[in-house]
């Protein structure tokens, strides 16, 4: 099943193309979501690749798991370069909530559950103000050393299964041998 936010981006792209606007995608060019958009739009640009300066109007969408602050910064820059920027760039609500929670976390360690290949998981690790740990499997989790951490927060990337999250919580709560 496709995420409703991703479906909304695809509808937005179709609308931008119908308006005759060149489409700029903010995201990782190798991410499945960005590749899917590019497959629908011939000649789409992936930031920082941009339409020529003589183009006056552009349409912008973003990978839904991008850092919301980074997307806003890039869109602001595009507004300075082009006369009209029709933006439908948005980060999915769950991703934004996770990013905000990580930014506001006051502990001294954060465990981010998710694959090392997940851009969403990597972004959560990047924006944390404290020491971060990442685990995508129980084997990776068991190799981590939390002994120097007083307050550990736990979050997960968008595609991390709830069952893995629950398994990790149960393992962390076990009595230490």
Model-derived features: where do they sit?
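The feature marks the mature, well-folded catalytic cores of soluble enzymes
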Residues: 1-177
């Amino acid at each position: 099943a496709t995420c409703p936010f991703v479906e909304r981006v695809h509808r937005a792209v179709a609308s931008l193309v119908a308006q005759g606007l060149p489409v700029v995608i903010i995201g990782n060019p190798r991410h499945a979501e960005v590749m899917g958009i590019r497959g629908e739009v011939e000649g789409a640009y992936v930031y920082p690749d941009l339409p020529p300066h003589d183009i006056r109007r552009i349409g912008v969408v973003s990978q839904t798991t991008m850092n919301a602050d980074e997307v806003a910064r890039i869109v602001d820059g595009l507004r300075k370069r082009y006369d009209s920027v029709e933006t439908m760039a948005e980060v999915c609500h769950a991703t934004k909530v996770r990013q905000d929670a990580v930014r506001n976390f006051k502990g001294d360690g954060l465990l981010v559950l998710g694959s090392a290949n997940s851009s969403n998981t990597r972004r959560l690790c990047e924006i944390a103000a404290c020491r971060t740990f990442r685990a995508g499997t129980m084997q990776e989790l068991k190799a981590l050393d939390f002994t120097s951490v007083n307050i550990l927060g736990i979050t997960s990337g968008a595609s991390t299964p709830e069952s893995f999250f629950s398994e990790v919580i149960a393992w962390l709560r076990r009595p230490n041998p």
